[in-house]
Each structure stands twice: as C-alpha cells, then as structure tokens.
A protein has these predicted regions:
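Acidic (Asp/Glu)-rich catalytic clusters
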Residues: 34-38, 57-66, 87, 91-98, ...
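N-terminal beta1-alpha1-beta2 module of alpha/beta enzyme domains
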Residues: 1-66, 145, 161-166
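Glycine-rich anion/phosphate-binding loops
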Residues: 76-92
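Active-site mouth loops of central-metabolism enzymes
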Residues: 7-27, 47, 72-81, 120, ...
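Glycine-rich, proline-tolerant flexible connector loops at the mouths of alpha/beta enzymes
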Residues: 41-63, 192-196, 328-342
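Hydrophobic faces of well-ordered beta-strands that scaffold small-molecule active sites
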Residues: 3-7, 43-46, 67-73, 98-102, ...
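Conserved, mostly hydrophobic/aromatic
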Residues: 36, 40, 60, 90, ...
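An alpha-helical appendage that flanks or caps ligand/catalytic pockets
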Residues: 1-10, 115, 119-161, 195-320, ...
Length: 375
C-alpha cells in the first residue's frame, strides 16, 4: 500500500489559534520534506493553502530522493495545455516523482479567483478538462470543442517519465463527482468517513467505472488525521488536549465558513459532528477510534484515528478491507507527528520503504523485534 503524509499549512499544536500556530518558512518545509522522505513514507500531499503548491513542490525536488509529490490543481485556474506542460516538466525534473490531485473546489473558494460556476457546472468543466489533459499527457495533438473548453492543435513537446501518464487523483462525493472519477481518474480519495460509508463510495465508483470500460483501473484512498500514542489512554489524553484548545470563537468561525460551501464532501464531514462541541469529547467518536472533533475547527477532512498503535493499525485494516490501499495521514504538529506515526505505525504497514535502504540491518532487526511486542 501507499502511505502519504501532508505538507501544507497551517501547522502547529493548535493551528486555529494564534498562540498555537507554527510560523512556516521555506526552511521548515525543507525539514519536513526531508523527514517524510527519510522516514519511509511514499510521499506527501501538497494541498491548496497559503503557499502555491506547485512552486512549493518544485522547490523541494532537490531535497528529497524517493518522495512522491501529490500536488493539487484546480482545473478552472489553468488551461489544460499549460497544466500538461507543468506536469511533464515536473515529472522530468523529479525523475517521475509526481502525482496530480485534481481539485474541483467549491463556489466560495473559486469566486476568490474570479471563477463563478455552479456545483454541477464545475464538474462538467472538469470532465472536459480531463478529456483534454489526459490526451495531452499521452502525447496526442488535441483538437477539442466543448461547452467550456476549446483547444486547437494543442500539444506538449515534453514526454513524461511515467507511462502511460502521470497518475491523476481526485475526490468528490456527489453523483457528478463519481461520474468524473469513473471516467478519468487513477486514484479516488475520500475524506475520513466511517469504513462502511467509504466502502459505499468504492462500490458506486467501481460500478460506474465498469460502465465506462475501466473495470479495475481505479485505486482508492482515505484521508485522515491521526492521534496515536503508545497506549489508548495517552492517545485520548492528547485528543482531549486538542479539544480543550478549541475555543468558541474558533468553532463559530470555522462553522460559519463551511456553512456556505456547496461541497457535498464538506457537508458530509459537517454532518458527523453537527457543529456542536459536547462536554465529553468521546460523544464525537462516530466509529471505533474514529473521532470527528477536528472538523469543529478545520474545514476539509475533519476526522482522526485516535488510539494506540495496535488500535490505529486495526482501523487502517478496516479501511483496507473496504477497498482502500492508499492512506493520507497527518497530525498536529506535522513534523513531530510524522516521526511518531513512522515509529509507531508505519513499520507494520506493507509500504515500500525505499528510504530505509541505507539503514543498518542491526537497527531494522532490533526495531522489528521491538514492534512484535505490540503487534
């Protein structure tokens, strides 16, 4: 399987608070990327945030060796021809270490960039966009006239390192999103709903993909926060500390922002906690070790796996049993929790940890023997 970390701010122990947020710098991102690379993760997601994900990712190529960059791209903000050229250039310079996360966004975010399309119009746009982009990445010369996109003799002179093309990833919870994923996407991502809810998506998209002649062509991933400690009690104590720092102002602000978003995925995340902060944080444990409290102060994915290493591994197995072989995880703060997850959980997952090639055999033997005690 593949396990990716996260490389986008804000960051800190309580990043929704001024006194809990970490100052981000290029040097810090270098440090974080090197850590992710060395610790044996597959790579990391560079999502939409304060920094431009493409410039950030390109600047980190020289500081990593195995790190796969999963970089977000919003179709309405770049022509498909320009994005294809960016992808080919990045793939060549990184020697094949790129995946592209196609992000449909929401009306509120897109309006900030001057794009005013309804929910279904955005997916219709993305459908046309990916038709053109995929052909360009295959090396074709493209002439296409659609409702939203019209290109004439479009082509990219640079071949990609990865064949037949750089992998395209995608997330979305509406019927329109499912259709786009089924037609075009290599890896479909879900935010951290319960394994049962996530499996329902897997089945729906597999059925649609088969209708498009793409049976078996799509892999599936899940995006989660993680709060893992050596014992369950320690993990829930850490979650309690995070919960105690969720002040009313932060919750009201976050919930006011997501209330106006037309993203179905965001609406499904918000429904898990209902915008309320009960006295007992365990009331937001929506499934074993799956806690929805993060969504009170963060938009986007808002659930965390909370527990001991053994419990977190069991819950990851639940998602694998539901058809997910890609895991994107993060913790707060990003750097410290990347090390913690790599120590407690990552060695027990079937990940190709190529970055460990230079580690001495005595170290790995001692480490593996130690981990057998908690497996």
């Amino acid at each position: 399987m593949e396990v990716l970390w996260y490389l986008t701010g804000p960051d800190g122990r309580y990043p929704w608070r001024a006194d809990g947020a970490r100052k981000l710098s290029y040097a810090y991102f270098q440090q974080l990327a090197r850590a992710v690379d060395h610790l044996g993760y597959t790579g990391a997601l560079l999502a939409t945030g304060s920094h431009d994900a493409w410039i950030q990712g390109a600047s980190l190529i020289p500081y990593t060796e195995h790190f796969q960059h999963l970089i977000a791209a919003h179709p309405p903000l770049l022509s498909p021809t320009l994005l294809a050229k960016m992808i080919a250039t990045f793939d060549q310079f990184s020697k094949g270490r790129l995946r592209v996360n196609i992000v449909n966004g929401d009306a509120k975010l897109m309006a900030q960039y001057g794009v005013h399309l309804s929910h279904d119009e955005r997916y219709a746009y993305t459908d046309e966009y990916l038709t053109v982009l995929s052909a360009l990445l295959r090396g074709e010369t493209v002439n296409f006239r659609g409702r939203h996109i019209h290109v004439v003799d479009a082509g990219v002179p640079l071949p990609t390192v990865q064949r037949p093309h750089v992998p395209l990833w995608f997330a979305g919870s509406s019927p329109a999103a499912y259709e786009v994923a089924a037609k075009h996407i290599d890896t479909y991502l879900s935010w951290g709903e319960t394994p049962e809810q996530a499996e329902t998506k897997v089945r729906a998209i597999k059925a649609l993909a088969a209708n498009h002649g793409r049976a078996g062509k799509i892999s599936f991933g899940i995006r989660l926060y993680v709060i893992v400690r050596e014992t369950e009690a320690e993990a829930w104590a850490a979650a309690q500390d995070i919960y105690d720092h969720m002040d009313e102002k932060a919750i009201i602000g976050a919930q006011a922002y997501v209330a106006g978003i037309d993203s179905i995925g965001q609406q499904r995340m918000s429904a898990l906690h209902g915008g309320r902060k009960p006295k007992d944080l365990r009331e937001l444990e929506i499934a074993p070790n799956l806690w929805a409290g993060i969504g009170l102060v963060r938009h986007g994915p808002g659930t965390a796996l909370v527990g001991s290493a053994k419990q977190v591994l069991a819950r990851i197995q639940d998602y694998r049993d539901a058809g997910h072989e890609v895991l994107i995880v993060s913790g707060m703060p990003l750097l410290e929790e990347a090390y913690r997850f790599a120590e407690l959980v990552l060695p027990h997952l079937p990940v190709d940890r190529r970055a460990e090639a230079g580690v001495t055999s005595s170290f790995t033997k001692d480490r593996d023997a130690a981990w057998q005690k908690i497996a």
